[in-house]
Amino acid sequence: EKQSFLSLDMPNRLLFYPKTVPNPKNTKENEVLFVMKILTSTQFKELDKYTIEHEPVSSTDLMERAAKAIAAELKSRWTTATRFIVFAGPGNNGGDALAVSRLLCNAGYTVQTYLFNITGRLSDDCLNNKKRLENLAGLLFTEVSSQFSFPEVDEKDVIVDGLFGTGLNKPLDGGYAGLVKRINASPAKVVSIDIPSGLMSEDNTYNNSSAIVRADLTLTIQLPKLAFFFGENQKYLGEVNPMDIGLSAEGLAA
């Protein structure tokens, strides 16, 4: 039975790179230490902008680059016998998910995609990728504006979580919280794009643990997020695999 989606209960930081440093005590001679710099969500936006302006590359093409890296990783782990169920949100995380859907479908996978457009407002890049999906043969695509029924899934399926990324600034509630609960209760493997939906990228103060996706695999864009280093968040992340999409090294060093 369908229900209304909205009423469903349900300092300086930067990149990971190898750098030889003078050996402190208790390290082996010639040992290479790793210096990890971690970006805030604002700094990530600035790095994206810097890459777009200085490479130069369009934001749509940069999103396509991320989607290709993610799709390649998924194809390396699962055969075309696997069904992917993709949940895309209205922002750029959702745009990534829609682009991944298209690439998987074109590679011969069965893909069932849901775009949650509750407010009627999509980011520009999400809208562009929606348009590229609409006439794609073989893709099961549903745009959700109010009514939603969670699909039947089994342990052989893979759910791709592309609902919300690092731009999230408040806990998920209503239909989105209910959707996350259904994802977490499902027998399918769960892969999150960039960060598990519902998890704040920098601060645990406002996390609602019952409304955060518990991923088996997190394919994070370019760099680990600050929240990944908090012990209490490990249960949401699963395996973390950074996807190098060629963001500007010059911008990272700035």
Identify the function of each model-found stretch.
Residues 6-8, 17:
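Short hydrophobic targeting helices and cationic amphipathic motifs
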Residues 20-35:
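Short, Lys/Arg-enriched N-terminal segments with co-localized hydrophobic residues
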Residues 34-80, 249-254:
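Positively charged, low-complexity intrinsically disordered leader regions
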Residues 36-39, 156-254:
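YjeF_N-associated NAD(P)HX repair module
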Residues 39-42, 57-69, 92-95, 124, ...:
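Conserved active-site and cofactor/substrate-binding residues in soluble primary-metabolism enzymes
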Residues 71-163, 171-193:
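Nucleotide and nucleotide-moiety/phosphate-recognizing core
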